[in-house]
Structures are given as C-alpha cells and as structure tokens.
From Swiss-Prot:
GO molecular function: GTP binding; GTPase activity; guanosine tetraphosphate binding; ribosome binding; translation elongation factor activity
Any one of the GO BP annotations: positive regulation of translation
Catalytic reaction list: GTP + H2O = GDP + phosphate + H(+)
InterPro entries hit by this protein: EF-4, EFG_III/V, EFG_V-like, EFTu-like_2, G_TR_CS, LepA_C_sf, LepA_CTD, LepA_IV
GO cellular component, one term: plasma membrane
Gene: lepA
Pfam families: EFG_C, GTP_EFTU, GTP_EFTU_D2, LepA_C
Protein name: Elongation factor 4
Segments forming domain tr-type G: 8-190
Source superkingdom: Bacteria
Amino acid sequence: MPRMTQLDLIRNFSIVAHIDHGKSTLADRLIQLTGTVAERDMKAQILDSMEIERERGITIKANTVRIDYPAKDGRTYVLNLIDTPGHVDFAYEVSRSMRAVEGSLLVVDASQGVEAQTLANVYQALDAGHEIVPVLNKIDLPAAEPERVKSQIEDVIGLDASDAVLISAKSGLGIPDVLEAIVHRLPPPKGDREAPLKAMLVDSWYDAYLGVVVMIRVMDGVIRKGDRVKMMQTGAVYGIDRLAVLKPQMVDIAELGPGEIGVLTASIKQVRDTRVGDTITHEKKGCAAPLPGFKPAQPVVFCGLFPVDANDFEALREAIEKLALNDASFTYEMETSAALGFGFRCGFLGLLHLEVVRDRLEREYDLDLITTAPSVVYQIYMKDGTLQELHNPTDMPDLTYVDHIEEPRIRATIMVPDEYLGDVLKLCQDRRGIQLDLSYAGARAMVVYDLPLNEVVFDFYDRLKSVTKGYASFDYQITGYREDFLVKMSILVNDEPVDALSMMVHRDRADMRGRAMVEKLKELIPRHMFKIPIQAAIGGRVIARETISAMRKDVTAKCYGGDATRKRKLLDKQKAGKKKMRQFGKVEIPQQAFINALKMDS
C-alpha cells in the first residue's frame, strides 16, 4: 500500500476557466498523457461524473484526481488536480477548493479572451494566495489571437502573460509543457508532519455502498486508517474505515501526510453531517483552532416544486431526500398550494443551481414538475421592531404592521463586445440597476452594476444573452440588503386569489408586470360557460384586469317571429343561470397555463 509523499514532490493545483474554455478537456489530456487512466477507460470529461454535467458541458461538483508525473528532471511528482465549477452559483465550492491548493492554471480561450467568470474565479485564486500560470487554449483555431489575449490578461487581470503556455487541449498540443510548468512554476505545499492533525474538508458526496465519502486536504499532521477524528464545527466524532486517493477511482492508501489530498469513509450517514470547509482533527490531542474561512452555504433563491400529477408526491419526497443527501446547500420544506396541491418550497444557491436540481429530479427520478416563480429572501422590518425573513410571497404579513422591506442587492460584472454595450446598459437600467463602473479591454467593455437580485432571478440572463446575441458573459456577488418600495402582487381568477402566481414586485414596475400577467392568463385559460374576470391586485387595489367572455348557447333559436318579450324572458333566464353559475362555478386552470404564465417574459 502506498505511503505518504515528500512535501517537495507534491503540487496541488486547480484549473480556473470560464464555461466552455476547455477546462475539463485539459484535465482529460493531463490524465491521459500521464497514463493515470487506462486508454480503454478514457471518456470525455472523465471528472464530470453526473450525466447532467456531461450534457450541459459544465462542472457542478468539485472533483479531484491524483496524477503521478515523471518529470524531465528525473524525479516523479504527485500532482493533485481539483477540477472546480466555473459557474457563479457554485462560487463557494470554488472558494474552498481554492484554499485546498497552492496554485492555479488560468485557462483562457485564445479566440474569445477573458470573460466575466474568469475574472471572478481569478480573484478568488488571488485571495487564496495562489501562484497563477496562464494557459491559452484552442490556439489551433483559425480565430485564435494569442498575442491579443495575452495583452488582455495583462490589462484586465494584471498578470504577466508573456510566458503563457500555448496549447490545444483537444488535439493534445502543448500538454507536456503544461505538466512541466506545473512542476517548475507552482510552489510545493507547506506543512508540519509532527504537528497535531489539521485537515480541511473540501467536499463530500453520498455513495450507496460506502455512505458519505469525504474529500480532505491535510494541512498538518498525519491521518491513518483506524484513527478517531473529530469535525470541529459539528463536534461529531468518527472512526476512519478507509483512506484512499482518487485516480479518479479510489486507490487505498495507509496514511496521508501534509500537503496530500485524499478521501476517507467513516460510516457517516448524511452529507449534512459533513460541513464543507470544516476542519478535521484527532479526537485526542487535536489542533487548537480550526482553519479560517468556514461559512455555511446560504440559499439565495427560493421556489416551489410541485408534481404535475398529485399521485407523484411521495416519489418527489423520496427523490428530494436522496438528492439532499448529496447536496448540503439545497434546502427544502413541505408546502401546500390551493392551486397546485402538495409540494416543496426549496432553496438554491442561484438560478443555475435551481435548473440543475430540477433537471436531475426530472431525469434521474422520472418526475414531471411544475416550478413556481423564483423569489429571493426579503427582510421585513415590522413596526414593533422585529425582523422577519420572507421566503414565499404568499406569507407576506399585512402592510399595516410593516415598517419597511429590504431586498438583496448584487454586484454584477458584465463583459460585452462594444457594439452591444448600449443594449446592455438599457437592460440594466430597466432592471433598476445603478452603474458603478465602465472600462474597456480592447474591443470589449466591462460594466459593473449594482442590481436587485429579484430583477435578476427572473429571466435576466436570457434577456442579456438575447440582446447581445450570446456574446455577453455575466457574473455576480451578493453584496447585502437595501430598503426599497416593494409590494406583493396577487393574481385573482374569478375573484379567487391564486397563491402560486403571487409575487413580490417593485411598486414602479407593478403595473407593467400585472398587465403582462393578466393578458397572458387571458390567452391561456380556456373559456367557460360564464365570464371570468382576471385581476392583478396590490392589497385591495386592482391594477390590471382582463375578462374572458362566456361561451353562449343560442336560447332564442326556437322562437320564430312572434313576441319580443318571449325572447327577452328566455335571455333573462339564461342570464340568471350564468350569474348563479359564476357564483358557484369553479374555474379550471390547466397545468400548462401555470407553466406558461410562470415563464412570463418581463
């Protein structure tokens, strides 16, 4: 069984890149070239284990692989690669993966240049004190402009890119240079073997056979199979059943020393018991203080998930419980809706996280789901001095008791080609944005805006992509809460409020949102035998109304000629019947109407 490795022969690194700049392909090539995985087992995106990761071409969970590399100087180095997500929703996964390694490869597409997410992740790498090696990928494309992109890296990020490694991950060109750069330009880890054990919990996932598998980076001390270890945040103590390194499959190892990255299993039942970023130490003679920088992931966007068929509720509950085993940042609680029946109110890190969870539920568990409009967490300050958090617009307290409402704001960074800048600025202004900064890097503008998160969760990303023909890239950080004039808008169908369609809106945009919603519902709800009013209301005041006219039977058809009062009598009788029908009749709103109404383009 392999023993631990000397510190000066270890290199821990991550790959930082925007979506689609070739990060997972580069990881594949490094694994392939060093023979870590046999040729027959190789497949594209080998580190992306979820089907949805391969299909969308994105990395969601941080994955790791240990590569043995015989360098040109005659020594064999151990390279630990942590493949991090590139998307903003998973920024916490990125931040703690960054703390587990000492260096980063910054991969930039030589034809596209620096994008917004590249920036966000590079800043995290710099915060973690990384040495960064720039790598220009896709240099064999006809549109590649390595010199322009090098100067862009220097202008926008401030990194010296003169000795950037030029590669094509797809064809394998330049990959040996990357391996040499990792060995010679990235620093070895520091650590003291004799000190008490201090290891950082980088990630954890649920395995049907092993229970929870925990990925750790040892900072100080040595961890061995059979040790009893303690999680410093939760105080839980476990005995280690198995220690291994990932190549990407598990290979057992006797011990892990400073600077090494590996996995352990210890009969842990739930992923929730292992807080990512937590510090692991020995139960006896443990370290004095935990590692800094731990914070539990907070859900930011909430929405309701309901089964289309009410009989699927139990299946949905089981699916959500299984999914939550593997995703500690996803929260859920039961809720009932008069319109949609039983379902769950779920919390997510962001919109992509929401989409990924919904897709996984539908695909892996074969469910049909309705998603209610996403909402953010509002802070409601009451007149009696108390503070309430509002996750669901239907729970909004009576306005007479409310002093003011605060909403979360974000700092959005948008990189956009110059010719689309005007459209992007207009979009941000329409969404109540405040411009903070505007700068240029070559032919691309970088705009920084302060925006309300509420305006972004709905369809901001889709609108941004459509006004820039897909060329803009967008990244955000949540900055805090600020007071604004927010109101709850209810939708009434036949004078009955429909809870699933109520939403929080800004007072200035309420009329427009309300009008758009009632017009859309008028198209979607089928006609009934009586007329149906559809209203958007704030409190008791109706701000928009449409009426679906009734279907009408010709009751006077059998009156040929004759007295007009005879016809009048029949029409009055029909009218009275319709009035009674409207009073007692129930309006059937088809499920498809909900789905389409919630997709509403604002």
